[in-house]
Amino acid sequence: MRLNNIKKAFLASAALLSAMSMSAAERFVSFKQGDLLINGNDKVEIYMDANDCRGVSYAANALVRDISKVSGSQATITSNQKATILVGTIGHSAAIDQLIKQKRINGNLLKGKREKFIITVVDNQLVIAGSDRRGTIYGIYELSQQMGVSPWYDWADVPVEHHDSIFVNRGTYSDGEPAVRYRGIFLNDEAPCLTSWVKNTYGTEYGDHRFYQRVFELVLRLRGNMMWPAMWGWAFYADDAENEKTADEMGVVMSTSHHEPMARNHQEYARNRKGWGPWNYQKNKANLQKFFREGIERMKGTEQIVTIGMRGDGDEAMSEEADTRLMTNIINDQRKIIADVTGKKASETPQVWALYKEVQDYYDKGMKVPDDVTLLLCDDNWGNVRRVPNAQERKHKGGWGLYYHVDYVGAPRNSKMLNVTPVQNPWEQLTLAYENGIDRLWILNVGDLKPMEYPISQFMDMAWNPRKYDVNSITRHTRDWCAQQFGESQADEAARILNLVCKYNGRCTPEMLDKNTYSLENGEWQEVVNQYLQLEADALRQYNSLPAAYHDAYRQIILFPIEMMSNLHQMYFAQAQNNALYKQGNPKANVWADECERLFKRDSIICDYYNHKMSGGKWNGMMTQKHIGYKSWNDAFEKDTCPELFRISASETPVIAEHNGVVEIEAPFFASKTDAAPQGKEKEGAKWVQIPFMGKSLAGMTLMPYTKGVKGASITYQFKMNALARNAASSNNADSKKVRIHVIIKSTLDYQNKGGMTYGVSVDGAEPILVNFNHNLNEKPENIYDIYYPTVATRIIDKVIEVELPATGDGIHTLTLTPNDPAIIFEKIVIDGRGGKGRVKII
């Protein structure tokens, strides 16, 4: 964000603005004094050209409501060009075009730009001008945000603080163009929560235009511009013809999911399988071509992105007979239909081909794709980028996209109930993607939309300007976002709590949590429970300190997910205690059984409050997801069930020291580190950075930027292990001189497809031992169940090596790690001198 051509009058108010939540260079709205009072006489007139885009009208009317929320002033849309506020799009607003012609505003800032706005004061009029319709819309919503209206005012009930006066300061304000061209969300896995809420709210069995209008407004307020609509049981295009019209009018680019080609929803086929015939292009080409043609005919004249290609029926893999030749024929035929229906070259209609699961194999095997088609890469459903385009592939004219998940249905187990994505993970992986040329389209699977408020905002903000966020500023984003929702005075504490709940929840999803997740023996279970209890207490303390108007928003965004996961951890901890004590014949097992049952009931009480009491029952049905009782990957069980219980009848350079034969070293507690040497024409190599909150324990250490070489880099740790204690711990076995070293790192995939990534481990200056940690971390049949699923679900790779530990006089040793590839994130090192006995602590 920047202010250009600042006038003297604006400088006079800089001292005032610097005390506000955003820097003086970022803000143009004030509530105490400024150059232009926009709500004088309690009336605000907003002018827009009647010939301007329909989406600008939607946003202008939203601004009318926002001004009323903030100040109580009466705002109206007027035909008076001397109105207090002028909004318009170049080429669609005569007033804006005239100001450019008169050089009252700099047209060069907008002409030829994409989705860019400028906000400036001309004489005594606030002017919001856009390079195109969405540029104008974003400018309008920028004013709303600076007035204090959160994009989440509706979807998270964030209150709007009252101000009697709204001032703006002279200058020209803009936030440039978006880095990623298409930025959107995918409503997915929407049953039972979103579907129940929609039925309770609108009385429909599907999402109609009333529902989608609210979603579209949120997307635009967040500076998104596209959507994949919900598609499990809904058909966006067929259920309500107003859906498509509303999207196009408001300025949202519609598309369909990775397995719904040619602007058709899967349900349009599924509801009439008998009529359409098998979803098999080899056997049913004519009918499927007709199905595809109808989709293109229906979307003609609207701004959409056409998904091309095919997957199997219902998001399954295609038949074994499918091959690259067949897929090539399908895409060629689809493009012929697009050209025929639109009367334009196929290349003039935006298209995307999703390289999802087995479809990526077709591309990797050399399938040729038209140069104008955007190639959509996908994460592994757990937030790990599978691959990035190489230097040659980045020349692809259609560009590259990314399909990213914070919600997932599938093996090893669903992840639907809560946001379990640590704040730092999307930032790190989206940075990886963007730095490797993935910048045409980003789409985020958000499940039911709620409770994914923060990851949606984070994703959209990064898509607009990923270079704004680095290792030093990612936590600042969380803080500023919390200031927007809960006020400046609450931002630091709210951000700390939000960071921690996302971090904690990322350790294990509620669906995968059970009595065996952590160890009772080494105290890990108790430690995790204590962390949640402390966090819950901190959140409740802040909740109670807030004005009542903020309670519902705070509960939705922060308190509810903490209460849910704290309670679930306590419940499974109680079950683990019950089961262990029962085996010992200890009657205290009954006490823990009672506690587990109490906590199971409390789970439903927490959800009931969310559904029926919070926000006056506004969110009835939104928290009805089953999450206790999983036996396999899916929630194919009738209702939540209490865990199995048993009862007994009534008849500093730091030197890390060992503890009980084990040394635990957090990655940031290094003795020394060496950055990478410059490679080729580089002025400097990659540097070690600490990623706060990254991983399962304290933080992560890695080399950045990822695009620079890592040769010559190393990081060294010191530890002290008493040889006698070690020998005693191992009972003088044959392995008494050996220790097991666990190097715990983030579960990064082999995104360069080079046969695995490696690092070296050296003890006391010995020759490094080379460790290839992810050569088999893939979905090949021989790896998927035993290696891939367990690893990505826990988000770490724990590689163990055995080394001979030489005797030293003081017991102090060094351990040096030398990464040989970028994007290796070290989280923790554990040296186990107990002869392989016992489980080491990961957290």
Regions found by a protein language model. Give the residues of each.
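An acidic-aromatic substrate-binding cleft motif
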Residues: W152-E205, R210-A230, G398-G401, G661-E664
